[in-house]
């Protein structure tokens, strides 16, 4: 597989074209950002940890019948993925109240949400990824009703699979975001799943083991990511 020019440079990943029109290479960098890119730092080992963590999770989801864009690891920091036509909507599933939900509704952090909630946000850094609803998605043509229904079904299936995985590792899956795209017309899970895009707390102590350690200045960010990976059995 020949790696060609950079197509896109995000806050923490770079996307490269290949000699296969249906495949891309994702490069996980050490860049760590918060507050829509207003704060950026370099954290040693982060790119490699997130690349391998993502590969582990995506393979678990594939095994559970959820189609993902992940194909294979290429190096410590690179993986081969399917080229998707991305839908500009983030799907967020919440099992416990945290983050923007707490700020938006004024509820106490850590309250269990039964059933889990499903939320939609427009992917737009300039606007701060605003909260939207299903009517917006349909009215602006970001996805069809059928595509949105499939995204919602997959989101809850991901929650079901990963809740057990993390629970067995002594962790609470507080919330997470997913992005989807189309591969030859079919809805496929894209982007990544790592501690950058979910909240994970230790089940006993409620210690934060995710990117909130960076956002809130708690320190030991990569050490927490590596501890989560170790508990799950991710080969680093």
From Swiss-Prot:
Gene Ontology annotations of biological process type: 'de novo' IMP biosynthetic process; cobalamin biosynthetic process
UniProt keyword annotations, A-Z: ATP-binding, Ligase, Nucleotide-binding, Purine biosynthesis
A GO MF term: phosphoribosylaminoimidazolesuccinocarboxamide synthase activity
Lineage top rank: taxon: Bacteria
Pathway: Purine metabolism; IMP biosynthesis via de novo pathway; 5-amino-1-(5-phospho-D-ribosyl)imidazole-4-carboxamide from 5-amino-1-(5-phospho-D-ribosyl)imidazole-4-carboxylate: step 1/2
Reactions catalysed, as given in the entry: 5-amino-1-(5-phospho-D-ribosyl)imidazole-4-carboxylate + L-aspartate + ATP = (2S)-2-[5-amino-1-(5-phospho-beta-D-ribosyl)imidazole-4-carboxamido]succinate + ADP + phosphate + 2 H(+)
Pfam families (UniProt xref): SAICAR_synt (PF01259)
InterPro entries, per database record: SAICAR_synt/ADE2_N, SAICAR_synt_PurC, SAICAR_synth, SAICAR_synthetase, SAICAR_synthetase_CS
EC number: 6.3.2.6
One GO cellular component, as annotated: cytosol
CDD domains: SAICAR_synt_PurC
Record family assignment: Belongs to the SAICAR synthetase family.
Protein name, per record: Phosphoribosylaminoimidazole-succinocarboxamide synthase
Organism of derivation: Pseudomonas aeruginosa (strain ATCC 15692 / DSM 22644 / CIP 104116 / JCM 14847 / LMG 12228 / 1C / PRS 101 / PAO1)
Organism taxonomic ancestry: Bacteria, Pseudomonadati, Pseudomonadota, Gammaproteobacteria, Pseudomonadales
């Amino acid at each position: 597989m020949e790696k060609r020019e950079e197509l896109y440079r995000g806050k923490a990943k770079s996307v490269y074209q290949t000699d296969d029109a249906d495949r891309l290479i994702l490069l996980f960098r050490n860049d760590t950002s918060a507050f829509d890119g207003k704060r950026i730092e370099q954290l040693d080992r982060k790119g490699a940890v997130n690349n391998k963590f993502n590969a582990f999770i995506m393979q678990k989801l594939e095994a559970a019948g959820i189609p993902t864009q992940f194909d294979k690891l290429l190096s410590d920091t690179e993986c081969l993925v399917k080229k998707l036509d991305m839908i500009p909507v983030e799907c967020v599933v919440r099992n416990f109240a945290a983050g923007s939900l707490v700020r938006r509704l004024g509820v106490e952090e850590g309250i269990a949400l039964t059933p889990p909630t499903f939320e939609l946000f427009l992917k737009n850094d300039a606007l701060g990824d605003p909260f939207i609803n299903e009517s917006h998605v349909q009215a602006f043509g970001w996805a069809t009703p059928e595509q949105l229904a499939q995204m919602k079904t997959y989101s809850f299936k991901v929650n079901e699979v990963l809740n057990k995985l993390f629970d067995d590792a002594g962790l609470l899956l507080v919330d997470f975001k997913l992005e989807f795209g189309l591969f030859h017309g079919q809805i496929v899970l894209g982007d990544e799943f790592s501690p950058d895009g979910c909240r994970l707390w230790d089940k006993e102590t409620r210690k934060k083991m995710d990117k909130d350690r960076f956002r809130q200045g708690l320190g030991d960010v990569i050490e927490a990511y590596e501890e989560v990976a170790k508990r799950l059995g991710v080969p680093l």
